[in-house]
Amino acid sequence: MTVLVTGATGFIGAHVVMELLSRGIAVRAMMRDVQLAEMFPESDLLEVVKADLFDIDSLRSAVQGCEDVIHCAATLYVRARDIQKEVVDPSIIGTENLCSVMQDVKRIIHTSSVAAIRPTKYQNGQVLSDEDWCDDATVSTNGYGLAKAEAEKRMRAWAEEKDIRLITIHPSVVFGPLLHKRHAEGSMSYLKHFVQGPPFVLDIHINFVDVRDVAIAHVNALELGRDRQRYILHKHGMWMNEIGRELTSMMGKKYTSRKLNKPLAYLVALLHPKLSIKRLRASLGKHVDYDVKDAFLVLQLPNYEMKTTLKDAVVSLEEYL
């Protein structure tokens, strides 16, 4: 059995590849830049293939002979300037293209996100579950939520009348050890802030989960869990200043926990290339929570402790940066 992993060089995808290899499972790691395969150890079980979600011929070749697909490919929202072109289209059109060549696939695990569950306009303190959908997103208001929700819908519609096992995994923000310096971007940029960012934090709440739990969930879901189920993976929620205090307590050195007030936060957003007042206004001082139900139990996950996740993530960041 060979498992195709799309987005194999991404943070989640790379950990999925490593988890499969650790179990002696043959992996076909799909990536656009094969030079990034250097992050993986040499192994007779690892086959590296160059393919692109917009190139159907390359996808067809990548899928050929694989009955199991773990679809992790995604675009980093934090670096995108053209949300439609760089985030929405790769997620939706890329998923449609992949579906078009998976005639012989029997099991697919699709990496979604809590972004596909959390509405753009949510109530402060709202608890969301796998029954919720991000149905109010647009490219301008919530491009990432739109991309994740619509890609999942496309995948589910494609699988609806097929004899195929489909499970979608919905992690919150993913923290944990890096496997390559490029993993310091994306979700880990929140913790990167504490390692080399300014001496203040914004009043933002972060829901997070360990990348190792997420990777194991993807692999275990090939066998475990209910077909067509959406599994939310979320461990803990903390305000940024709480994370700073926790790191200071654990690591034996000072990490920033000074919180900016709203006027200063909006000024920072105005000047920061990756922030906007619109995006900040939607999240500043607000939070949601997630009901993971029996996801960790059913998928038999280690359930890493919050302190372990934060410590391992920051130690790894400091090694790579």
What are these regions (language model features)?
Residues 80-81, 135-140, 180-181, 187-209, ...:
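A conserved pocket-lining segment of Rossmann-fold NAD(P)-dependent short-chain dehydrogenase/reductase
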Residues 138-166:
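Active-site Tyr-X1-5-Lys
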Residues 217-277, 307-321:
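Mid/C-terminal beta-alpha module of Rossmann-like enzyme folds, strongest
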Residues 269-302:
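Conserved C-terminal active-site "lid" loop/helix of NAD(P)H-dependent oxidoreductases
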Residues 161-164, 176-188, 221-231:
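Glycine/proline-rich active-site loop of Rossmann-fold NAD(P)-dependent oxidoreductases
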Residues 34-36, 41-93:
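NAD(P)H-binding glycine-rich loop region in Rossmannoid oxidoreductase-like domains
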Residues 3-25:
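N-terminal Rossmann NAD(P)H-binding glycine-rich loop of SDR-like oxidoreductase domains
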Residues 81-142:
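Conserved Rossmann-fold NAD(P)-dependent oxidoreductase catalytic core, especially the SDR/UDP-sugar
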